[in-house]
Curated annotation (Swiss-Prot):
Residues holding ATP: T39, G65, D66, G67, T68, L69, S70, E71, T96
One example GO MF annotation: ATP binding
Listed GO biological process terms: phospholipid biosynthetic process
Family stated for the protein in its record: Belongs to the diacylglycerol/lipid kinase family. YegS lipid kinase subfamily.
Organism listed in the record: Xanthomonas campestris pv. campestris (strain 8004)
Designated name of the protein: Probable lipid kinase YegS-like
Ranges of residues in domain DAGKc: 1-134
Enzyme class: transferase
Record flagged with keyword NADP: no
Length: 309
């Protein structure tokens, strides 16, 4: 039997990771043909995935943070082939927050993550397809809006590198006096909500922005989109809630959040609204977010909380 052929796509910011280098060496000694490609500029992941498909690679591994995972997943989803034909997807978490990996219980150490890919068969997973003013996008984890999105967008890259997820909380605290509600109309099958909100989570996965568990019950294989809307409140209550949301405190969300589970959701706003798509901001006045069932296959732990079975 021919050896497994993998293509690891590494975020260029993590090229100095010695643990990853050693882990790649271990997998190669086990007989896996493991090639490494490093992203340098926009479009590299798309090109590397296309090359992997043309080369008959069996598994594409995203090595980086949530943005790298989403970029590689999107590059796979852009191809017309179905999930059974496309290479499977693996993840080595090397980002600041690693929200998807944390929620999915994927090992945070490179050797453990690569070992999981070798040991566990790939399973179907959903992806979010987002249509906006500037064309379609794909999202593997969570699309978020409002207070949490501004925190993620504004968090300094140097601060993230030094402090990890704590950087998001510090940035959130600095915004306490300027939580601006956003007005929007949300519609989906048998669902309609209109008003001002301060936080929004659209979950394929469960958490984003350094531990904000906006969609704590989301599943990655149920064909449904988990929606969490945190309505606007007034004065000090809003500021306090904003801090709790940033810190991932579920009690605050449970008391005030509007929650539903839908195959798709449309969002309309008079003012431009920014959604954070796994770290990439997209601004539009209209969004359609659809959960595309079983779009890819991914290697996940047997006890992964995001799986329905």
């Amino acid at each position: 039997m021919a050896p497994s052929h993998w293509r690891l796509i590494l975020n260029g910011k993590s090229t100095d990771n010695e643990d990853l280098r050693e882990a790649v060496g271990v997998l190669r000694k086990r007989g896996i043909q493991l090639d490494v490609r490093v992203t340098w500029e926009e479009g590299d992941a798309e090109r590397y995935v296309a090359e992997a498909i043309a080369d008959g690679v069996q598994t594409v591994v995203a090595a980086g943070g949530d943005g790298t995972l989403s970029e590689v997943a999107a590059a796979l989803a852009h191809h017309q082939d179905d999930a059974a034909t496309l290479p499977s997807l693996g993840l080595v978490p090397l980002g600041t927050a690693n929200d998807f990996a944390t929620a999915a219980m994927i090992p945070l150490e490179p050797l453990g993550a690569l070992g999981l890919i070798a040991e566990r068969a790939a399973e179907p997973i959903d992806l979010l397809r987002i249509d906006a003013d500037h064309g379609p996008h794909w999202c593997a984890n969570v699309a978020s809006g409002g207070f949490g999105t501004q925190v993620t967008v504004e968090t300094d890259a140097g601060l993230k590198k030094m402090l990890g997820g704590l950087a998001y909380l510090i940035t959130g605290m600095s915004r306490l006096g300027r939580i601006d509600p956003i007005s929007a109309h949300f519609t989906g099958p048998d669902f309609s909500w209109e008003g001002e909100f301060i936080a929004l989570g659209l979950g394929n996965g469960r958490q984003a922005g350094g531990g904000q568990a906006l969609c704590p019950e989301a599943l990655i294989d149920d064909g449904l989109l988990d929606v969490t809307i945190v309505p606007a409140l007034n004065g000090e209550v809003a500021a306090t809630l904003g801090t709790l949301v940033t810190g991932g405190k579920q009690a605050a969300l449970e008391r005030v959040a509007v929650r539903t589970r839908l195959p798709w959701l449309e969002i309309a706003s008079v003012q431009p609204l920014t959604l954070n798509l796994d770290g990439e901001p997209e601004t539009s006045r209209h969004f359609r977010v659809e959960c595309v069932a079983a779009r890819l296959r991914m290697h996940l732990p047997i006890d992964c909380p995001l799986r329905s079975a």
